[in-house]
């Protein structure tokens, strides 16, 4: 019966899985981090040179000096990777550039090596170490440079057209028509001009010349009629140039020369305008005649220019066959080429050569129109040419005759990837351009005879731009280092945000939506929930990025004559794929590669078709090429609703590495490659035999008898404060092959990804403890450390120089008992291995206080002992709330030891504290199908429901969580898991090609489990069986990084905001819980006036009141009445700042003087005694008047009222 279990597949040398896949793997997965590493390699080998060649040579304004680039080299890094991490430094290498300075007057040449700053290096796994932390440069998905056409309908239902020429760097050029069919142009987003103005500015002044060039077009005719010039052609060209200058530089004096040079600089100057190789490729492709000729009726006969043989006659409709015959001729430089001579007044005086073919209009079959291409412009011409402009305008007019196609902006043929190499190059170019200006200025200032390249170069702008990019760019991100899968996904992430991209506020629904071109290129499932949904995507498993930045996906070629599927692989971009019909990978094949079925399900563009095998051009390589690595790790993905699959993919990245992880019993076969390529596993460089193994190192004797030594990472803190630890996966004497995993990283077992555990799970409601997705777990999970994880946090203390003297790290701390110092060494630093709790001292530190006026006693002491009592305050580093644990490591950095420290810092101490966190109530857990929940109860093992053989289940999940969520994959995984466990095997069920329902039931039957997959379950408390049979099985379950220890928080006495004097918010600030508007309504509704009053005063921002209340509580007295909240004063001050005269009135509309409004001490103002205060002031006035009238000394007024009693002297 073992034949039911699929076929055995080895993943590494330590794991065999039974795979249910039926489709043979014809293509190996590419390396999953290549998208990062290959791009950076290109940058180091070619990108840097390309950039220097673009910027140099730099000449001075007189042309006497020129600075040229010769070569560059990267030297050895200053720090190793480990040293860079420890010292909070960058892992970078010095860049040295050889420059040649030529003096053209004397012919003297000076060559010199110039240091160009430290350049960050990429690690082997595709990350950068910046300031000691690992960072990743996320690839960016942007609109490709090129020319794009679109159409729309105006309010009257008329079709209007538009076109945009988008460069990589430079001004945009836009064409548009309006409701009257007039054609306009916008240059660099300015106000529109008639399109004919641009054509005239290129040097084609007369109307007949323009009409002749573009053929008959209504839109052109109407525009010419509107743009009437009575002047001769040449002066019209000058007028057009001035019109454009007026638009671009309004208000400035215009001359023909300045207008000409401005337009030239905007579009035709290679230094100012850059299409990049990809823009040139896209423009040549779009404007080529091949794309427009198909199905057009020719208005002229086409013949071979050499032999005169007729290829197609006038009146012929161009079919695929005719187009195939024409194609080689269209690529020639002597076929249907037409040259136009522009006026000398135009932007560029050179003749313009284009390729033209005449056809009949589809709208009016009598009318002849021209199809024009830009000729054959070389791939290295990265600026626009007049031929590009004319051909793009011609295409624009052709669209109005139903010739040509509009473009879909969200099509992946029009969106490209900017990878790390290109992003770095762009940033470096910005720095070099700034440096170029400095060099030019210095050339004109310095003495020509003595100047050297070193004196001309200022590397500060270059260093600053690179530093800014790595430090603060939106695309330079702190690496997600929760687990290897999170790391790998981060490296393969594609973001549409960032400089030059979209912003999440302006991104509409269309940009975020799944597009048919995502198939095999971007994962349709994995994307964040929330405001970034659809803007951040993940590269599909088999996708690669080509040299132009377009994503390609592999397909198996179908032979065009035999119609059999071959093993030849073609990588296709999205726009090339649009030309073919492609069958799915699940289409059944015969042994010889022919299709079994007469009708095959296939795709063409966005349509799903049923076609005969002879129509098919390509076939998918494997079903999982559609999804990303994380989605490909979800078994039975095809049985989950996509929203839940999205959550499942995201939850896997949040799994915490456990102490003793296990790979899933039900896997997908993706686990080995994900772990291998993540960069966290240690991999053998060459084949050999393991000679020595311990926890810290592995030694392998190669076949050529050389010895390789591999050092393992031990208990390092990861970016996500998790424990990064490697453990050997091989034994002494074992033979290894090259590229095999020899040591597991975090969350790995036997070279496979192991994000969680395989507990026994029952779908059972239990005393309402799993209400609303809550999870009930067995105490065994806690006792046996099944879900225990290790967390490492680091804390730093710096001793700085202050104005009053240097801070000191010491054991002698004022007003601290000996018991608080028990774990500190003689220097005042905590010992390794000490167990510390919240508030314990880690590093003793004192800071000088300002010298105060000495008291008589201190003066006496000073006179006797001759030294001033040291005035210092305790600024020791203490364990923050929830940070207790065991001190794992202490690092001390001092200048004496040769460590680089920031200015003003004399000594720095870093303490690592390790916590062992067991699973507990409040922790979040999840499966791989988006079935998440928090733990509501840790139930004693003896009370858990148990199986007929006495085994208690480990976890109880609510069965109500399955039907409405439609993630049935978890139920299938549950049954298959228990069957595999009973049979003692691991299984692989790849996505879209895994175990069918029949396979699963066959395996369940073979394992001897009931045919419904359910079992009788007994109540652990009573021993009675539950009424119904219950689904019990094994499902992979993860502990997520959202742990209650990091979230739980209660404020006692804490900090207040400076302006409003209200408590801060959030755990990090030790803040309070906001009692918001709706909570106030609730208390108002209950009529709880006193509770409400104290919440709005003492507990919030009544500064005096809270102090008095505190004093009263300490002394055991009655709590005084509250006073004025600080926010009321802030409101008054803000209104006063607007120039409003604010008066506070009592209930009788009498004014109260808020003298304390200006008084910093914020004292005697009581909102409850407003009328009382008014009375006091009235009495005072009367008393003063009486005193004036009476010559005798006035009778003393009773003062007891005006100096309010301590009860009244409160705050709000």
Curated annotation (Swiss-Prot):
Annotated Gene3D superfamilies: 2.40.50.100, 2.40.50.150, 3.90.1100.10, DNA-directed RNA polymerase, beta subunit, external 1 domain (2.30.150.10), DNA-directed RNA polymerase, subunit 2, domain 6 (2.40.270.10), RNA polymerase alpha subunit dimerisation domain (3.90.1800.10), RNA polymerase Rpb2, domain 2 (3.90.1110.10)
Entry-linked CDD domains: RNA_pol_B_RPB2
Keywords per UniProt: DNA-directed RNA polymerase, Nucleotidyltransferase, Transcription, Transferase
Disulfide bonds: none
Feature: compositional bias, Basic and acidic residues: 1176-1195
Region ranges (Disordered): 1176-1212
Keyword Transcription: yes
Reactions it catalyzes: RNA(n) + a ribonucleoside 5'-triphosphate = RNA(n+1) + diphosphate
UniProt GO BP: DNA-templated transcription
Family: Belongs to the RNA polymerase beta chain family.
Subunit structure of this chain's protein: The RNAP catalytic core consists of 2 alpha, 1 beta, 1 beta' and 1 omega subunit. When a sigma factor is associated with the core the holoenzyme is formed, which can initiate transcription.
Function: DNA-dependent RNA polymerase catalyzes the transcription of DNA into RNA using the four ribonucleoside triphosphates as substrates.
Protein name: DNA-directed RNA polymerase subunit beta
Record organism: Lactobacillus gasseri (strain ATCC 33323 / DSM 20243 / BCRC 14619 / CIP 102991 / JCM 1131 / KCTC 3163 / NCIMB 11718 / NCTC 13722 / AM63)
């Amino acid at each position: 019966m073992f034949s039911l279990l699929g076929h055995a597949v080895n993943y590494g040398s330590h794991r065999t899985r039974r795979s249910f896949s039926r489709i043979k793997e014809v293509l190996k997965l590419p390396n999953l981090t290549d998208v990062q590493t290959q791009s950076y390699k290109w940058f180091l080998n070619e990108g840097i040179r390309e950039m220097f060649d673009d910027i140099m040579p730099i000449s001075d304004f007189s042309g006497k000096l020129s600075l040229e680039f010769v070569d560059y080299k990267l030297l050895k890094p200053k720090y190793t990777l480990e040293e860079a991490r420890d010292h909070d430094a960058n892992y970078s290498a010095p860049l040295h550039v050889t420059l040649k300075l030529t003096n053209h007057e004397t012919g003297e040449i000076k060559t010199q090596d110039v240091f160009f700053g430290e350049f960050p290096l990429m690690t082997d796994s595709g990350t950068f170490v910046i300031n000691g932390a690992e960072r990743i440069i996320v690839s960016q998905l942007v609109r490709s440079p090129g020319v794009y056409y679109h159409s729309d309908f105006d309010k009257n239902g008329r079709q209007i057209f538009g076109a945009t020429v988008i460069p990589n760097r430079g001004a945009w050029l836009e064409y548009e028509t309006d409701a009257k069919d007039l054609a306009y142009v916008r240059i660099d987003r300015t106000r529109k001009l008639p399109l004919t103005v641009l054509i005239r500015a290129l040097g084609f002044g007369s109307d007949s010349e323009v009409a002749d060039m573009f053929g008959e077009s209504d839109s052109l005719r109407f525009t010419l009629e509107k743009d009437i010039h009575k002047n001769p052609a040449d002066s019209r060209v000058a007028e057009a140039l001035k019109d454009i200058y007026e638009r671009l530089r309004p208000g400035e004096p215009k001359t023909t020369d300045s207008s000409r040079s401005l337009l030239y600089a905007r579009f035709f100057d290679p230094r100012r305008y850059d299409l990049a190789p990809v823009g040139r490729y896209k423009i040549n492709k779009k404007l080529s005649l091949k794309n427009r000729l198909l199905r057009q009726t020719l208005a002229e006969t086409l013949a071979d220019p050499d032999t005169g043989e007729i290829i197609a006659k006038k009146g012929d409709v161009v079919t695929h066959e005719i187009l195939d015959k024409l194609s080689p001729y269209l690529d020639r430089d002597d076929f249907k080429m037409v040259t136009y001579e522009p006026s000398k007044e135009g932007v560029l005086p050179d003749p313009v050569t284009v390729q033209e073919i005449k056809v009949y209009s589809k709208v009016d079959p009598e009318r002849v129109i021209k199809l024009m291409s830009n000729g054959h412009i070389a791939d290295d011409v990265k600026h626009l040419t007049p031929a590009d402009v004319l051909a793009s305008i011609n295409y624009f007019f052709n669209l109005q005759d139903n010739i040509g196609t509009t473009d879909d902006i969200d099509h992946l043929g029009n969106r490209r990837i900017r990878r790390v190499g290109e992003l770095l190059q762009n940033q470096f170019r910005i720095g070099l351009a700034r440096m170029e200006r400095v060099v030019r200025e210095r050339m004109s200032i310095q003495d020509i005879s003595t100047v050297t390249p070193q004196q001309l170069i200022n590397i500060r702008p270059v260093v600053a731009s690179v530093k800014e990019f790595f430090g603060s760019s939106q695309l330079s991100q702190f690496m997600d280092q929760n687990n290897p899968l999170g790391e790998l996904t981060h490296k393969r992430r594609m973001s549409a945000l960032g400089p030059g991209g979209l912003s999440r506020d302006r991104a509409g629904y269309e940009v975020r939506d799944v597009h048919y071109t995502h198939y095999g290129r971007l994962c349709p499932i994995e994307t964040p929930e929330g405001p970034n949904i659809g803007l951040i995507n993940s590269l599909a498993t088999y996708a690669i990025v080509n040299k132009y930045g377009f994503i390609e996906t592999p397909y198996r070629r179908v032979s065009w004559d035999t119609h059999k599927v071959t093993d030849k692989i073609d990588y296709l971009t999205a726009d090339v794929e649009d030309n073919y019909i492609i069958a799915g990978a699940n289409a059944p094949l015969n042994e010889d590669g022919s299709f079994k079925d007469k009708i095959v399900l296939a795709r063409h563009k966005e349509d799903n078709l049923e076609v005969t095998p002879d129509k098919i051009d390509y076939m998918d390589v494997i079903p999982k090429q559609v999804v990303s690595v994380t989605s490909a790790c979800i078994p039975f993905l095809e049985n989950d609703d996509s929203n839940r699959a999205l959550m499942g993919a995201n939850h896997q990245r949040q799994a915490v590495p456990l102490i003793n992880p296990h790979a899933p019993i039900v896997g997908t076969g993706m686990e080995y490659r994900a772990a291998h390529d993540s960069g966290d596993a240690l991999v053998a460089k060459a084949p050999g035999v393991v000679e020595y193994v311990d926890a810290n190192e592995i030694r392998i004797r190669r076949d050529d008898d050389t010895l390789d030594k591999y050092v393992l990472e031990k208990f390092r803190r990861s970016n996500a404060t998790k424990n990064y630890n490697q453990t050997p996966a091989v034994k002494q004497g074992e033979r290894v092959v090259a590229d095999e995993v020899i040591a597991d990283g975090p969350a790995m077992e036997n070279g496979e990804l192991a994000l969680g555990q395989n507990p026994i799970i029952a779908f059972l409601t239990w005393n309402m403890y799993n209400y609303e997705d809550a999870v009930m777990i067995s105490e065994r999970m806690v006792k046996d450390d099944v879900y225990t994880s290790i967390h490492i946090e680091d804390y730093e203390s710096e001793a700085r120089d202050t104005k009053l003297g240097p801070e000191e790290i010491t054991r002698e701390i004022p007003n601290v008992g000996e018991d608080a110092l028990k774990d500190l060494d003689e220097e005042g630093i905590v010992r390794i291995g000490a167990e510390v709790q919240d508030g314990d001292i880690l590093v003793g530190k004192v800071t000088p206080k300002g010298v105060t006026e000495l008291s008589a006693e201190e003066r006496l002491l000073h006179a006797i002992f001759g030294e001033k009592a040291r005035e210092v305050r305790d600024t020791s580093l203490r364990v923050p709330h929830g940070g207790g644990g065991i001190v794992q490591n202490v690092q001390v950095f001092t200048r004496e030891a040769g460590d680089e420290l920031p200015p003003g810092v004399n000594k720095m101490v870093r303490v690592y504290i390790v916590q062992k966190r067991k699973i507990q109530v409040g922790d979040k857990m999840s499966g791989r199908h988006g079935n998440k929940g928090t733990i509501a109860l840790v139930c004693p093992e003896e009370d858990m429901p148990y199986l007929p053989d006495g085994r208690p289940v480990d976890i109880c999940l609510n069965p109500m969580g399955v039907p409405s969520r439609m993630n049935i994959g978890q139920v299938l995984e549950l049954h298959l898991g228990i069957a595999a466990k009973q049979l003692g095997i691991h299984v692989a069920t790849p996505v879209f090609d895994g175990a069918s329902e029949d396979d699963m039931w066959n395996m369940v039957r073979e394992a001897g489990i009931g045919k419904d997959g359910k079992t009788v379950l007994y109540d652990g408390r009573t021993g009675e069986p539950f009424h119904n049979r219950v689904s019990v099985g094994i499902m992979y379950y993860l502990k997520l990084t959202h742990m209650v220890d990091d979230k739980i928080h209660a404020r006692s006495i804490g900090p207040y905001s400076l302006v409003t004097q209200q408590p801060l918010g959030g755990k990090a600030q030790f803040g309070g819980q906001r009692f918001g508007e709706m909570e106030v309504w609730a208390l108002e509704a209950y009529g709880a006036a006193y509770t409400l009053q104290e919440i709005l005063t003492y507990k919030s921002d009544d500064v005096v009141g809270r102090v008095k209340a505190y004093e009263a509580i300490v002394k055991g007295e009655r709590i005084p009445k509250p006073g004025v909240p600080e926010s009321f004063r802030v409101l008054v001050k803000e209104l006063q700042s607007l120039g409003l005269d604010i008066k506070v009135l009592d209930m009788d509309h009498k004014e109260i003087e808020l003298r304390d409004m200006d008084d910093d001490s914020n004292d005697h103002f009581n909102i409850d005694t407003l009328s009382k205060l008014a009375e006091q002031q009235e009495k005072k006035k009367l008393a003063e008047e009486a005193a004036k009238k009476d010559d005798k000394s006035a009778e003393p007024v009773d003062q007891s009222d005006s100096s309010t009693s301590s009860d009244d002297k409160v705050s709000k």
